[in-house]
């Protein structure tokens, strides 16, 4: 079993896709270890996305991610990172396979409904950013 971190982004929350996405998580065989509904401060968004700080989209990304509530979750199943990446689809919803979360719910490449860790190492870092050990079950 491995873990991954997922986030339902502000557009996914605003457009009322949280229930559908959580249902999909369970249908895909993930165990939800931790779940939080919160609004990131701009400072927290900058810290979370600091790996992108040199990229031209960094400030827009941080402003967007702190613009409204998000849902953060730690998930577990076999091949968690890879499986979640397959479930959500390509970053650009125009390129996402039919039936993936981004094909179904994303507005654009930027407002693409969900985030998913891209490696086991990043999953561990991202989970620890949002959850303390006693908050995971």
From Swiss-Prot:
Q: Which Pfam families match?
A: NDK
The UniProt entry annotates the active site at 115 (pros-phosphohistidine intermediate)
Q: Where, in this chain's numbering, is ATP bound? A: 9, 57, 85, 91, 102, 112
Enzyme class, first EC level, given as a word? transferase
GO cellular component terms, semicolon-separated: cytoplasm
* Location in the cell: Cytoplasm
- Keyword Transferase attached: yes
Q: Which top-rank group of organisms is this from?
A: Bacteria
Swiss-Prot/TrEMBL cofactor(s): Mg(2+)
Q: Which reaction does it catalyse?
A: a 2'-deoxyribonucleoside 5'-diphosphate + ATP = a 2'-deoxyribonucleoside 5'-triphosphate + ADP; a ribonucleoside 5'-diphosphate + ATP = a ribonucleoside 5'-triphosphate + ADP
Which GO biological-process labels does this protein carry?
CTP biosynthetic process; GTP biosynthetic process; purine nucleotide metabolic process; pyrimidine nucleotide metabolic process; UTP biosynthetic process
EC number, as in UniProt: 2.7.4.6
Return one GO MF term.
Answer: ATP binding
Keyword tags: ATP-binding, Cytoplasm, Kinase, Magnesium, Metal-binding, Nucleotide metabolism, Nucleotide-binding, Phosphoprotein, Transferase
| Role played | Major role in the synthesis of nucleoside triphosphates other than ATP. The ATP gamma phosphate is transferred to the NDP beta phosphate via a ping-pong mechanism, using a phosphorylated active-site intermediate.
The family note in this entry says: Belongs to the NDK family.
User: Which HAMAP family does this chain map to?
Assistant: NDP_kinase
Q: What does the subunit comment say?
A: Homotetramer.
PANTHER family listed in its UniProt record: NUCLEOSIDE DIPHOSPHATE KINASE (PTHR46161), NUCLEOSIDE DIPHOSPHATE KINASE DDB_G0292928-RELATED (PTHR46161:SF3)
Name of this chain's protein: Nucleoside diphosphate kinase
Write the lineage as a comma-separated list.
Bacteria, Pseudomonadati, Spirochaetota, Spirochaetia, Leptospirales
């Amino acid at each position: 079993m491995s873990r991954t971190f997922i986030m339902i982004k502000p557009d996914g929350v605003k457009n009322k896709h949280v229930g559908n996405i959580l249902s999909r998580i369970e249908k895909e065989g993930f165990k939800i270890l931790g779940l939080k509904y919160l609004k990131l401060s701009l400072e927290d968004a900058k810290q979370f996305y600091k790996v992108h700080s040199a990229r031209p989209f960094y400030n827009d990304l941080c402003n967007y991610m702190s613009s409204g509530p998000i849902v953060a979750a730690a998930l577990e199943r076999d091949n968690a990172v890879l499986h979640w990446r397959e479930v959500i689809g390509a970053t650009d919803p125009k390129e996402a396979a039919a039936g993936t979360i981004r094909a179904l719910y994303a507005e654009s490449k930027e407002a693409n409904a969900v985030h998913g860790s891209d490696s086991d190492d990043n999953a561990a870092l991202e989970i620890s950013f949002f959850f303390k050990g006693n908050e995971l079950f």
